Design a protein with these regions (language model features):
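Well-ordered beta-strand positions enriched in small/hydrophobic/aromatic, beta-favoring residues
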Residues: 68-70, 158, 384, 407, ...
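Active-site diphosphate/adenylate-binding microenvironment
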Residues: 6-9, 14, 18-19, 32-36, ...
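Active-site-proximal structural scaffolding
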Residues: 227, 267, 367, 449, ...
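Active-site nucleophile and cofactor-binding loops and adjacent substrate-binding regions
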Residues: 24-26, 45-55, 70-77, 132-133, ...
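N-terminal alpha/beta PP-like core and its mobile active-site loop of ThDP/TPP-dependent enzymes
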Residues: 1-335, 373, 377-380, 434-436, ...
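Thiamine diphosphate
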Residues: 98, 106-113, 308-310, 316-318, ...
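A generic structural signal for residues located within well-ordered alpha-helices
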Residues: 52, 116, 218, 365-369, ...
C-alpha cells in the first residue's frame, strides 16, 4: 500500500502496538501530526514542553516495561528534549524518540530551526538515525524499537526531514530485523555460572547486590526466590527499590551514599558480593578501593561493557539477568551450601542497632515523617515518582516499597523536574488499575516542569504532587552546611509562589498542610477525588538526609544521626 512518509511513521507505531505517545508539534514534524489527527489507533498526550514529553514517555516505560514513545519537532523542539534523552540513557530506559528535521535540501545551510540533531543525540542515545529516503522509514522504526528494548535497554532517536515525510512510497513493514552487528548476549556461559555457584556454596558471608538491571529484566521475583532458597541477605541500589519487598526478613536496606547502616556494613563485610544488574555507580560504592574489599565478586550483567568497568570481578557473567537467575535457581540442588544464618542475624543486629530514624516533632512536620506517613496511608496502592534532592532520598529511605516498578526516579542523571512528567506517564500506564500515581517533590524541583499541571488537567491525569516544602534547595544546602562551613550560597528559596493558588490557576486541586492531621486529611481527599492535585507540605527547614557517606570515604565511614527513635 502506498502512503506518505508521515503516514508510514504513524502506521509503524501502530504496528509496534503503541498505545500512548507524548509530544509537541512544530513545523518540521507537522506532516506527522497531520496523520496523527487522522488516526485513532493510539492516544497522543500534548505536553507543554518537549523535555516533559520525553520524561513522560520514560515514566510510562518505567511503569510498564514497554518502550515509551515521544515525538518532537526540529531545532529548539529537539534541544529541549535532550535532557530527557540523557536521563533515559543513564538509567537504561527503552524509548523511541522521533524528531522532525528541516528538508534535506536545507540541511547544512543553517536553515530555520535547523540543528544537527543526530550529532547532539549521539552521546546520549543507545543508537540514532537520520532518515535519508522514505523507503527506509519502516525498517528504521522497526529497528529502533528492537534496539531500544533488547540487550541493555536505552533511548533510540529517529530524525526525519520534513520533505521525506511528504513523499509517497510503498509501505512494507518488516516482520523482523536484520542487524548482523547487533547481537546482545542473552545466554550466560554455563562454565562461568558453575564457578559462580561453587563460590556461593563456599562463601560464609554472601550478599546479593541488586541493581536497576533487575527491574529492567523483570526478574524481581526470581531474585527474591534465590535469596529465600539460599538464605542470602540482599541490598538494593536506589534504582532497584521494590525488588526484595521491604518487609522481607532477608532485605537489609538500600546501600550507598544515603544507604542504611546495615546495608553499607553488609557490603563492607561480605566475603562474596553477587552483583545482579548493578553497575557499581560512585553513589553506591563510596571510595572504590574500599568497596567490598574483603570479597570476591560475581558480576552478572547483559552489558559486557559494564563488567570490569570499575570493579574487576572474579566471576564475570554476561547474559540476561532473568535467564541467568532462573538457571541459578534450577541448579541449587547440585550444590551443598554453607549455613548463612549467623551472617543474616549479624545484619539484622546491625539494623536493630542503627535503624533508619529521625527526630520527630509535635510542633512541625518533619519531611521524613511525611514520607513515612504517606507509606502508611497508601502502601502498595501507590506508584511513587520523585524529583531529585533530599525528598528523593527520604522517599527511597522511608516509603515501604513492596514490588518492582513501584518506584520511578531519576538515578544516573539526577534530573530536577523529572517527577511531575514522569508521574504523568506512570498515571497513563495505570489507567485501568486501582493504583495511584504520586510525585514526591521539593519546592525547587516542582517549578522546573510546573507547566505540566495544565497537561494533567486537560487529560484528567490524576497525579498527586506532594511537595516537601522547606524553602531551600535542600540537598545543596545540606552539602553547604556539612562541607562548605555553612556558606549558604544561592540555596534559599523563601521567595516562592503560593502553590495552592498556582495549582488552582491551572485547574487542579490544592492543599496547604502544616499539621499532621491536615496531612492525613489532604492525602485521603486527593486520593478520593481522583483529580490532578498538589499538596504543599510545610516541613522543617534544616533536616539532613542521614546516613551519609561523604565524598572520598568508604561505605563504613558514615555520618549517622545522633538521637531519634523513629524507625
Amino acid at each position: 500500500m502506498k502512503m506518505t512518509g508521515a503516514k508510514m511513521v504513524v502506521e509503524a507505531l501502530h504496528q509496534e502496538g503503541v498505545e500512548t505517545v507524548f509530544g509537541y508539534p512544530g513545523g518540521a514534524i507537522m506532516n506527522v501530526y497531520d496523520e496523527i489527527y487522522k488516526q485513532n489507533n493510539f492516544k497522543h498526550i500534548l505536553n507543554r514542553h518537549e523535555q516533559s514529553s520525553i520524561i513522560a514517555a520514560e515514566g510510562y516505560a518505567r511503569a510498564t516495561g514497554k518502550t515509551g514513545v515521544a515525538i518532537v519537532t526540529s531545532g529548539p523542539g529537539f534541544t529541549n528534549a535532550v535532557t530527557g534523552l540523557a536521563d533515559a540513557y543513564m538509567d537504561s530506559i527503552p524509548l523511541v524518540v522521533i524528531s522532525g528535521q528541516v528538508p534535506t535540501t536545507i540541511i547544512g545551510t543553517d536553515g530555520f530551526q535547523e540543528i544537527d540533531a543526530v550529532g547532539i543525540s549521539r552521546p546520549c542515545t543507545k543508537h540514532n538515525y537520520l532518515v535519508n529516503c522514505i523507503e527506509d522509514i519502516p525498517r528504521i522504526i522497526k529497528e529502533a524499537f528492537h534496539i531500544a528494548s533488547t540487550g541493555r535497554p536505552g533511548p533510540v532517536h529517529v530524525d526525519i526531514p520534513k520533505d521525506i515525510t511528504a513523499e509517497i512510497a510503498e509501505f512494507v513493514y518488516p516482520k523482523e530485523v536484520d542487524l548482523p552487528t547487533y547481537k546482545p548476549t542473552v545466554n550466560y556461559n554455563k562454565k562461568q555460572l558453575r564457578k559462580a555457584m561453587n563460590a556461593i556454596a563456599n562463601a560464609k558471608k554472601p550478599l546479593l547486590y541488586v541493581g536497576g538491571g533487575a527491574i529492567l529484566s523483570n526478574c524481581g521475583y526470581e531474585i527474591r526466590e534465590l535469596a529465600e532458597k539460599l538464605n542470602i541477605p540482599a541490598v538494593e541500589t536506589l534504582m532497584a527499590r521494590g525488588i526484595m519487598d521491604d518487609k522481607n526478613p532477608l532485605f537489609v536496606g538500600m546501600l550507598g551514599m544515603h544507604g542504611e547502616y546495615a546495608a553499607n556494613m553488609a557490603a563492607h563485610e561480605t566475603d562474596l558480593l553477587i552483583s545482579l544488574g548493578a553497575r557499581f555507580d560512585d553513589r553506591v560504592t563510596g571510595r572504590l578501593d574500599e568497596f567490598a574489599s574483603k570479597a570476591e565478586v560475581i558480576h552478572i550483567d547483559i552489558d559486557p561493557t559494564s563488567i570490569a568497568k570499575l570493579v574487576k570481578p572474579d566471576y564475570p557473567i554476561v547474559g540476561d539477568l532473568k535467564i541467568t537467575v532462573k538457571a541459578m535457581l534450577e541448579s541449587i540442588s547440585e550444590y551443598e551450601f554453607n549455613d548463612y544464618t549467623n551472617w543474616v542475624e549479624l545484619l539484622r543486629d546491625y539494623r536493630e542497632q542503627e535503624p533508619l530514624r529521625f527526630v520527630d516533632s509535635d510542633k512541625e512536620i518533619k519531611p521524613q515523617w511525611a514520607v513515612k506517613r504517606l507509606g502508611e496511608l497508601l502502601d502498595d496502592k501507590a506508584i511513587i515518582s520523585t524529583d531529585v534532592g533530599q525528598h528523593q532520598m527520604w522517599a527511597a529511605q522511608f516509603y515501604p516499597f513492596s514490588f518492582p516498578r513501584q518506584w520511578c526516579t531519576s538515578g544516573g542523571l539526577g534530573t530536577m523536574g523529572f517527577g511531575l512528567p514522569a508521574a504523568m506517564g506512570v498515571a497513563k500506564a495505570l489507567e485501568d488499575t486501582d493504583k495511584v500515581s504520586v510525585n514526591i517533590t521539593g519546592d525547587g524541583s516542582i517549578l522546573m516542569n510546573i507547566q505540566e499541571l495544565t497537561t494533567c488537567v486537560e487529560y484528567n491525569i490524576p497525579v498527586i504532587n506532594v511537595i516537601l516544602n522547606n524553602n531551600y534547595l535542600g540537598m545543596v544546602r545540606q552539602w553547604q552546611t556539612m562541607f562548605y562551613d555553612n556558606r549558604l550560597s544561592e540555596t534559599d528559596l523563601s521567595s516562592q509562589p503560593d502553590f495552592v493558588k498556582l495549582v488552582e490557576a491551572f485547574g487542579g486541586i490544592g492543599y496547604r498542610v502544616s499539621t499532621k492531621e491536615e496531612f492525613d486529611a489532604a492525602i485521603k481527599d486527593a486520593v478520593e477525588k481522583k483529580k490532578p492535585a498538589m499538596i504543599d507540605v510545610l516541613v522543617a527547614r534544616n533536616e539532613d538526609v542521614l546516613p551519609m557517606v561523604p565524598n572520598g570515604h568508604a561505605l563504613n565511614e558514615m555520618t549517622l544521626l545522633e538521637g531519634g527513635d523513629n524507625e
